[in-house]
Curated annotation (Swiss-Prot):
One of its GO terms (cellular component) is extracellular region. Immunoglobulins are composed of two identical heavy chains and two identical light chains; disulfide-linked. Residues 110-116 are annotated as: Complementarity-determining-3. It comes from Homo sapiens (Human). This is Probable non-functional immunoglobulin kappa variable 3-7. Residues 1-21 form the signal peptide. The lineage of its organism: Eukaryota, Metazoa, Chordata, Craniata, Vertebrata. Keywords: Adaptive immunity, Cell membrane, Disulfide bond, Immunity, Immunoglobulin, Immunoglobulin domain, Membrane, Secreted, Signal.
Length: 116
């Protein structure tokens, strides 16, 4: 039996202007998982964000972030169907239907609704 790998899940902040910031809080911060499992990652915004501006990224050590999902639910080019995104308002989700060995990475949500 393969030992579970660590899937890291971090917090990303955007500072939209001098008066208000949108804080994106992701949970859980880490997961111990095995290949084949279903994974659900959550992202909550401190204020409502248009779905059109919500993106998810995957990052592996030593590599640039890879765009997975844009517009909250649209897969980027060449992203496998096991990745799906959903949500609106303040609550968004990234789901990996069956975790593959190559999916062990850091995942970020980002909002582009309000930028600095």
């Amino acid at each position: 039996m393969e030992a579970p790998a660590q899937l890291l899940f971090l917090l990303l902040l955007w500072l939209p202007d001098t008066t208000r910031e949108i804080v994106m809080t992701q949970s859980p911060p880490t997961l111990s998982l095995s290949p084949g499992e279903r994974v659900t990652l959550s992202c909550r915004a401190s204020q409502s964000v248009s779905s059109s501006y919500l993106t998810w990224y995957q990052q592996k050590p030593g590599q640039a972030p890879r765009l997975l999902i844009y517009g909250a639910s649209t897969r980027a080019t060449s992203i496998p169907a096991r990745f799906s995104g959903s949500g609106s308002g303040t609550d968004f989700t990234l789901t990996i239907s069956s975790l593959q060995p190559e999916d062990f990475a850091v995942y970020y949500c980002q909002q582009d609704y309000n930028l600095p």
